[in-house]
Amino acid sequence: YNAKETDSLYKHIPFYIRLNRGTKQAVGYFYHNTAECDFNMGREKRNYWHRYSSYRTDAGDIDLFLIAGPSIREIIERYTDLTGKSVMLPKAALGYLGSSMYYPELPENSDDAVLDFIDTTREEGIPADGFQLSSGYCAVETAEGIKRCTFTWNNKRFKDPADWFAQMVKRGIIVSPNIKPGMLLVHPLLEEMKAKDMFLPASDDNAGVDGLAVGTWWGGPGLFVDFTKQSTREHWKQYIKDT
């Protein structure tokens, strides 16, 4: 996998499963290393030997766990015994979750469009349980034009967010809004959050601005929220509730 040449991923974990097509038996490979790495899954071809797989990492040790199966299910069980189990998902998360950037990007009345979509799923007998709300809901005017600013609402698209959420709940739908974990430098709440000491400090590798690290976010440069701090997590939760 190469992020520069293929579709980007939100994260990658150096774990994979190899299945023998003949025996139908599997084995898991987990490389316990957080450094940047790449895998060659048998794509290499040389004239003197058969195709082979390889692993390369920029730093750290080759700390490899071979996880016995023979079934894929048993490998996953043992892999999660090693790394930790995920929290049990809510039942609704196992159902159909609607999602579309189209509705939140409409010039106006996105709220009505989403409600109409949910009503249509009911009419067509599609048992929808949730809706992933794309970030168009928080696209608002700033000093540098329209930007997606977490914890704001575009009131042309969502006229009364509280009422809209109530209507979705009434229809049995759990809404999962896209909440970006960074604050643009033009964000209207930036100074308030700075005063609450919610951002990562600058470093030797990132001079930043005003002593705070800066990265590239959707819409331009912004600050990194420091979720390692208990106080930041509490402030963040309160912003979600208030919004």
Language model regions located:
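Catalytic and substrate-binding clefts that recognize carbohydrates or anionic sugar/phosphate headgroups
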Residues: Y1-A93, S99-Y102, S110-D112, I118-E123
